A protein has these predicted regions:
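Active-site helical microenvironments for divalent-metal-assisted chemistry
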Residues: 1-121
Length: 121
């Protein structure tokens, strides 16, 4: 379930960087739905503050945004979002062995590996 992934991303962030990073880790996939609106991001900021809102915006891939050419550089421009995304990528990368389709494993290995290289990891 998606909540377990969010918790797996948030836990090491909490241990290394604290509450702000952990909150963004918990929310890092929450806004990647077509039904989310600008008001949802504003609401996030009202609840958790502008630093969390900015990082959640940065870590949220926009519909139609090219992953490696647009999204990853934009995400990595925000220091909190970058740490969250790297933790997310590491979690995803470490779980690739559970994906049954070998073509999907190869594609995602390349995608996550390239993004981690872009982060300097």
């Amino acid at each position: 379930p998606i909540m377990f992934h969010a918790m797996a991303v948030a836990k090491p962030l909490m241990e290394k960087y604290g509450e702000t990073h952990a909150i963004v880790g918990l929310l890092h996939d929450a806004y990647e739905n077509p039904w989310n609106t600008e008001a949802d991001f504003v609401g996030c900021g009202e609840i958790f503050g502008p630093e969390v809102e900015a990082a959640v915006r940065a870590v949220t891939k926009a519909e139609g945004e090219h992953y490696l050419e647009e999204y990853i550089p934009r995400c990595f421009a925000n220091p909190i979002a970058k740490l969250v995304k790297v933790t997310d990528l590491e979690n995803n990368y470490n779980g690739l062995h559970t994906i049954p389709n070998p073509d999907d494993r190869v594609r995602l290995t390349a995608k996550y590996g390239t993004a981690l290289e872009m982060a300097g990891e």
